[in-house]
Amino acid sequence: MARSPEILADNLFFPEGPRWRTGPTPKLWFSDILAGKVMTVDLAGSVETLADVPESPSGLGWWPDGRLVVVSVNDGKLMSVSAGTSK
């Protein structure tokens, strides 16, 4: 018998590239390409927007120091995000 999936977050436009991060507050990180946002969802289901990336955020990664790296597809940029800002 197939299992029914559990909804972790809804009202998203085009969620992409989920990445799990452990730590004091484990979260699933993902891009919402059409909304232009990098977001997280925690184990309790709380969704948070971490960065606005208007030109379609896609792949995510991290520098060794913990800063987020985001691919911005439409403008061909690789961006670093720290403390709520993108550059």
Kindly give the residue locations of the regions a language model identified.
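Sequence-structural signature of mature extracellular/luminal beta-sheet repeat domains
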Residues: 1-87
